[in-house]
Amino acid sequence: MSYFKLIFSNKSILRTLQIEEFESEKLTGNCIEFGANAKIYRNFLKADHNLYKSTFSNLNSENKDIIKIDLEKKLLHKKKYDNVIIFNVLEHVSDINIALKNTNLLLKENGKLFGSTPFIYRIHAAPKDYSRYTKDFIKKSLKKSNYK
């Protein structure tokens, strides 16, 4: 990824670093990306886009092509995915354990969860941010939600 492209992509420094880290992942199969109005990460991946299909979920989207899945409610969506992408999503939910259990239910066996959550308030203080998590808390929550 060229830094020129990233600098002029209108992304924050945090988002730029996340994209840089994530772009090396080789995604295959079906993916669902939460909080993604504009296919944020798909646009930056070096992966062959013919090897995977993306679905996007955002509760606030008015785009009818973007499905609405509330990670804090009983999961009615039955489709399973090879990859779940949740960058900058967990800080917007009031119960991380329910959200992580639901993302796990969306994954096929041996599926992968990709994501991050900001730790410093001033770095990403979007509306309706509820929490900040330490690495240890995230690990404990993932284990509690049956992630391996």
PLM-predicted stretches and their roles:
Residues 26, 46, 94, 108, ...:
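Short conserved AdoMet
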Residues 114-139:
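Conserved class I S-adenosyl-L-methionine
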Residues 1-79, 83:
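Conserved N-terminal segment of class I S-adenosyl-L-methionine
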Residues 146-148:
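Conserved S-adenosyl-L-methionine
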Residues 94-98, 125:
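Short N-terminal helix/helix-N-cap motif within the alpha/beta-hydrolase-1
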Residues 89-90, 119:
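Hydrophobic adenine-recognition pocket in adenosine-nucleotide-binding enzymes
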Residues 97-112:
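A short glycine-rich, Lys/Arg-flanked "PGG" loop and its adjoining helix->strand segment in the class I
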